[in-house]
């Protein structure tokens, strides 16, 4: 299955929008909203977010191969700006996203499920788990299938990814 940059960017935008709505309404996610949040994959492989995308004239500086991502990138920045309390918070969100472009690659659920199954088959059922780079929590979810009462501590340094994790 090929990595569809445009679809991944769309999925991320919808997940961010959903997280901001949940924050604003101070409530837990519905089943449908959880599904949207779980499609969030971070911005690894989406270097387009490093390009300027404030106004239409910025598009002339984009590579031709990335132009189809210009409008969604503008939408992403607008969404973050509209949901930031001030320019400082907006800049922190964007800086966090940009810092993750080279590092935010998420492990597919099929792999985390297999790892959890192998550990369980070997009678490894942790009472405590530390997830230092949690993303949207796929390792935690997989491990909790076999150790539902485990005490979990999950961290995520990317600010927007951390919001996804908090709502999952």
What are these regions (language model features)?
Residues 1-168:
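Class I S-adenosyl-L-methionine-dependent methyltransferase catalytic core
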């Amino acid at each position: 299955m090929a990595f569809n940059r445009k679809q991944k960017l769309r999925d991320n935008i919808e997940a961010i929008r959903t997280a901001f709505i949940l924050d604003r309404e101070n409530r837990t996610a519905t089943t449908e909203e959880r599904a949207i949040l779980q499609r969030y994959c971070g911005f690894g492989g989406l270097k387009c977010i490093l390009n300027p995308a404030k106004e239409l004239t910025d598009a002339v500086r984009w590579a031709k191969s990335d132009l189809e991502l210009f409008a969604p990138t503008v939408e992403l920045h607008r969404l973050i700006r509209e949901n930031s309390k001030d320019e400082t918070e907006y800049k922190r969100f964007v800086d966090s996203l940009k810092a993750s472009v080279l590092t935010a690659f998420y492990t597919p659920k099929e792999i985390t499920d297999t790892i959890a199954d192998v550990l369980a088959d070997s009678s490894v059922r942790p009472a405590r788990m530390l997830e230092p780079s949690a993303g949207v929590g796929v390792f935690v979810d997989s491990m909790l299938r076999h150790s539902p009462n485990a005490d979990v501590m999950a961290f995520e340094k990317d600010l927007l990814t951390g919001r996804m994790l908090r709502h999952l």
